Amino acid sequence: MANIALREYHRKIERLIENHQIEEAFSHCANILRKFPKEIETYRKLGKNFLEKQDIELSERIFNIILSVFPDDFVANVGLSFIHENKGEMDQAIEHMLMAFELQPANPSLQDELKRLYHKRDSVEPNKIRLTRGALIKMYARSNLFDQAIAEIKLGLYEKPNRIDFKLILADMLWKAGSRIEAVETCVDIVSQLPYCWKANEILDLAFQDLHREQAESNYRLRLAELDPYYRFMLPATQSVADIPDIAVQIESDLDEENGINDWANFLADTWVVSSL
């Protein structure tokens, strides 16, 4: 029996996908999910693998699962844009590509892709892709310009109240700015809609630890550990889960065909309850 660090296992699966070894990649993803059913990095591999296989229905479901954890995930939004375009749903295709653009507004490939999508929908290609409010919000957030970010987010939520990613950045900015009660209230609202949203659970766990240092783990931390088993090893002094050594989480990499996942649709339905974002 060969054990491998979970992060190294992810890198191995990524290489299989890059080499178009789709079925073997599926088997290794199933091996991880049998032990860690909500391990979110494996779902990133699965989404790309199902898209490579041209299984649109399952790849769409998986990308929506990822967005329920990371509402502005770059790869999931690009993947969903591609899927909606292929289904002829151009408004949704543009919406998801804009979400990706907001993370990388200076990326010329994304700008060109948006121009192409607008031309396909409207028969007119814009000369320039304008900076969106979402892109501005995320630029302010990355620079820790709390007041500017919060002001823009409140305007953004007035215009688009369903933008969960805006609410999430608002909670993060409020927490960092010291408005912790308002940050916690915002996160409670988010997890009522997206129970496994990473950042919201992370902030709520920090708030719980501040109040109950001697008590057992919070439900929020347990959820985070379901999504990333390395989170079980987080200590108060640990800055980020990425600082946990790779070898902390090991998994057997020998495949057992009898324990594979034959019906991915049922597995996803049993493991997650997620609506399209």
Kindly give the residue locations of the regions a language model identified.
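Register position in tetratricopeptide repeats
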Residues: 18, 52-53, 86, 103, ...
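Helix-start (N-cap) detector for alpha-helical repeat units in TPR-like alpha-solenoids
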Residues: 5-6, 40-41, 74-78, 108-109, ...
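Structural marker of alpha-solenoid helical repeat scaffolds
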Residues: 35, 69-70, 86, 103, ...
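Intrinsically disordered, low-complexity acidic segments enriched in Asp/Glu and Pro
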Residues: 108, 143, 211-214, 227-277
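Alpha-helical segment of the N-proximal tetratricopeptide repeat
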Residues: 4-41, 45-58, 131-158
